[in-house]
């Protein structure tokens, strides 16, 4: 376990100092400020008809933040295995007294710890800037719960993307191949959310990780955490409807992580 934490700490600090993450923090700050400025006018227009306009303002950031963070997670996942392999850094780690599973687990732990910090920063800044520009939510407790659900769902989706790209980095040795497959998969996953694609594939759309992620926020009609016109948010109803999707995402993360560790262990031999 100590070896995993050492690798995780190194990966966290290495990625945190990268220009990519600095760029991300700048984009996070700009997007929350721009959204708050727009919502300061927009949300007051629906005050009379909306039960809780505050979450509608957060919902404006949903697709932007989801696509943005998923591509950030993809870049990180490619960097930590395929990128390191392309410059020979993995060969240095393998010569150390480390098991293959320690390297993969440590890299994923450090990477996802940084993503968790960035997601938390994004949600906190988004809520704080909205509270300053528009005002406090009508029900602070319910809004806080919805913000936690949004942040947790976004982090789970990012974790799934990182473990998927790590798995691809272990399977395919060429950086270009991993980059092409990962980007293509993510673009297709988001593109498949279009209505005419759903009409063609029907229930098979549920295998799409983007669909699984979106269903965490709105698992069934009436349980959308961003719906400003809902009179009451019933947590038990949301939990019962969203739990299968959350378990599916966690199971996918676990299976891809286990497969990555096993395959990388074979490479070590």
Placement of each model-derived feature along the sequence:
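Transmembrane helix boundary and interhelical loop/hinge segments in multi-pass membrane proteins
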Residues: 74-94, 100, 108
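Short cytosolic juxtamembrane segments of multi-pass membrane proteins
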Residues: 265-269
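Secretory targeting signals
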Residues: 28-77, 105-173, 235-240
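Helix-capping/transition residues at the boundaries of transmembrane alpha-helices
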Residues: 14, 82, 93-95, 165, ...
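Terminal transmembrane helical anchor/hairpin motif
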Residues: 38-56, 179, 184-263
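Aromatic- and glycine-rich beta-strand/loop motifs that create alpha-glucan
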Residues: 1-28
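Residue-level recognition of transmembrane alpha-helices
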Residues: 25-28, 107-108, 182-183, 249
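Hydrophobic/aromatic residues in alpha-helical transmembrane segments
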Residues: 73-77, 90, 125, 164, ...
